[in-house]
């Protein structure tokens, strides 16, 4: 098999779609996953990429954490920006419980996390991690949407960083083929296929997304999580869209 990479797009709480995709890859694309050279992602996409690489057996645990996290946000008077609610602390607690002690070693030079320098607004892809805490900090930085996730920016190596999805929402690696995964309909390998829309696309932070009403709804759901039933449906969509891709590429097993 030629050089294959997997890249998961930034998408907030639509990351449940990515978990459905990851579950399908583990169940029906084992040979593909085994041969993947590198994993990449931004924001929620980087979180799922890190789990698929370092702790694939914990995908179901991630699902349950995501459902509970979303329920917490829905219960807040003003969602994630409710005064007194610590979005980043909750996210960190999930990472602490899911990522294994050796996560940084497993991720070394194989996980590429998109982050944005708060001062220069330049994008960086980080792929070296000196410790588990180092990895967690980079993942937190990649997921930090200013104001929404809090006011205190994430510090890493003496600089302040924010959400990688603001500058590169879907990292494409320079070597080999990068299989792209996104819960937004667009020019992607694995994504929903919106029907009956004008064939118009907009490039948002290096991700080609179709101009459609469904994508506008998804954008809202990324920051304001929908009901658990809808999130379960999004998970199933991620699973089903990935199965279609595996069948089409003759990687299904």
Swiss-Prot record:
This is Patatin-like phospholipase domain-containing protein 4. Residues 6-176 form the PNPLA domain. It comes from Homo sapiens (Human). The gene is PNPLA4. Keywords: Hydrolase, Lipid degradation, Lipid metabolism, Mitochondrion, Primary mitochondrial disease. It holds the Pfam family Patatin. One of its GO terms (molecular function) is triacylglycerol lipase activity. The keyword Mitochondrion applies. It is linked to Defects in PNPLA4 may play a role in mitochondrial disorders characterized by complex IV deficiency. The triglyceride lipase activity is inhibited by BEL ((E)-6-(bromomethylene)-3-(1-naphthalenyl)-2H-tetrahydropyran-2-one), a suicide substrate inhibitor. It is an enzyme of class 3 (hydrolase).
